[in-house]
UniProtKB/Swiss-Prot annotation:
Covalent cross-link site, Tryptophyl-tyrosyl-methioninium (Tyr-Met) (with W-102): 229-256
Name of the protein described by the UniProt record: Catalase-peroxidase
GO molecular function term, any single one: catalase activity
Active site positions: 103
Cellular component GO terms held in the UniProt record: cytosol
Gene assigned in the entry: katG
Family: Belongs to the peroxidase family. Peroxidase/catalase subfamily.
Binding site for heme b: 271
PTM summary: Formation of the three residue Trp-Tyr-Met cross-link is important for the catalase, but not the peroxidase activity of the enzyme.
Reactions this protein catalyses: H2O2 + AH2 = A + 2 H2O; 2 H2O2 = O2 + 2 H2O
Presence of the UniProt keyword Oxidoreductase in the record: yes
Region (Disordered): 111-130
Amino acid sequence: MQMDAKTGDISGGCPFHGDGGTRSLLGRTNRDWWPDQLQLEILKEGGRNPDPMGEDFDYVEAFNAIDYTALKQDLTDLMTDSQEWWPADYGHYGPFFIRMAWHAAGTYRTGDGRGGSSSGQQRFAPLNSWPDNGNLDKARRLLWPIKQKYGKHISWADLFILTGNVAIESMGGPVFGFGGGRKDVYEPEMVYWGTEEQWVDTGAETRIHPDEGRALENPLAAIQMGLIYVNPEGPGGDPHDPEGMARDMRETFARMAMNDEETVALTAGGHAFGKCHGAKPADTFGTAPEGENLHLMGMGWLTDEEEIRNGHVTTSGIEGPWTPNPTQWGNDYFRLLFKYEYELTQSPAGAYQWTPVDPEEADMAPDARDPSKKVPTIMTTADMALKRDPDYRKISERFRDDQAALDDAFARAWFKLCHRDMGPKVRYQGPEVPSEDLIWQDPVPSGTAPSDSDVSSFKSAVLDSGLTVSELVKAAWASASTYRNSDHRGGANGARVRLAPQKDWAANDPEELGKVLSKLDELRGNLSMADAIVLAGSAAIEKAARDAGHSVSVDVTTGRGDATDEHTDAESFEPLEPFADGFRNYLKTKASVKTEEMLIDKAHLLGLSIPEMTALVGGMRALGAVSRHADHGDRIGVLTDRPGQLTNDFFVNLLDMGTKWEVVDESGDEEFVGKDRKSGDEKWRATRTDLVFGSNSQLRAQAEVFAESGNEQLFLDTFVKAWTKVMDADRFDVTYAKYN
């Protein structure tokens, strides 16, 4: 199949067609884009792991054993080791590798923490074939000899980012530091990238809602399908709207946690290097890697070899460098941006770009292949936005006049870009980890593990405090369940559930939560609040099991610290607020994704298996640990006559054929009533996240196991294991202690 360089049209169309209403959790998938793609899923049946390194491989240990100095020297040497099959522009691969690293990290989004550089996803579809990643397959091939040499000691994920750092350093640019430890995965991650049927051009903006001020669909960050950030030609490809371009830039960069200053610094810093490629008509652009012929060995976007050697290459379609010194760090970008007036032109590929009016020869750039030739510099509509938007312009003028300020801002913003999805600083490895703690790393002061006697006394006091099992379990869940396995943010460590904004989230039942936290603070003595919240939840679960005639022990790894407002960027935590939390039967409002699919999404972010998710839902319902419903208080989904006891009643009653379920008409298919099949009397109220465990064949199979006589202990053990997993999900201070 052929794909157009500008529009992203794939010949033959796409077999997946949404109806414009409710979408699936994952939207358009690789199979939709490439129906003939080799399917390996059958080999993963039975839980077979595709990781060839095996479960016992410790990547962090391997990384820390690398000859780091030698690796960086090899990367430095590569920068100017131009290869005939893909020659370096200006004799230097630095700009090419910066783009590779930028695009590896730049898929990160704050909405769900997915994307980013932490697992080397740029190697796989769809990212390896996005139009915005055009020709980066060659960058990865250039790196292969170094990856092969250092083997298990450097992951692709780490190599992408470190190579970007070395590229900047090799051209005189500023670098703040580097933290390694990104472990490769060996298959595409299941991420929602959008529902559009084509990439980049008109028709690829269904995520934008013009009637709502061009609001961008959550959790997406890129403005169009197949882009990392924005369309460089302008909003929807319209170059006549630089102000609208600024709006798009502000939105998309904010969704990857960047403010205006960081946005300007990153844009200017990235565009200080290299050039855009649009030397040929767009219709000569070859097929993307994932759809190419077998004998091309995973390479795509190919053209005539002689034209490649001559630099006649098309990627974005825009053609030309931004500065007269494309392989040297400096301030030429801002100098030229403000020195000249720019006129709208088109590249040989037909892309819109901006060219300086009457440029001086000294401000011309060398040709990428023949330094004796001079070519004009260019700006994109995105660059023009920095000049047109008042706030961006103010920052840009300051950077133009203060090189040191630009150096520092770019170095810090680049570091943030490349490390935002790595989680707490304790996960960073290697000799170049900066000592400075940064607020976006969500720092937590070190805690002290309490004595066994202090723990025992506290748990007894909690159970005598008058707080209910439900209240204690809900508080612990509210604290820990913010964790995201995607970017390793959130979790119980730090007890940020007592700080803004988390303390006021509707899902947390703020009034009840405040009462619980106040009492725990009164009782905790020398314990941190973070430990106290989790210990109180464990005490409640143990009591609930005893009250049901069982005995369980809920292990708690103590030693958590307490964060303060000073340690917390409250605004950055707002995307962690749950829109839906099926474990608590919470739904803010009906969404375009089915409620039960949002439960699956939440379980995925928590790193849970299907049995763990199932047991947690059933256990939380039995404990009465659900968010308060407008009409039914804390009873919706609580399918038991003995709430507060840890039983398998939820599954038993859900699967009872003596109950007939009906939709509550005014609920919009979100709420259901369970009636006695004979008498017609109401027995239960439930939601989609309850009934899915009876309606979905795979989830029903799980529920049946937990409902069976003789499997009560299996249910309890699975619930406790899953609960502990969630409570300890963010304890990198413990799991990484051996490396630091």
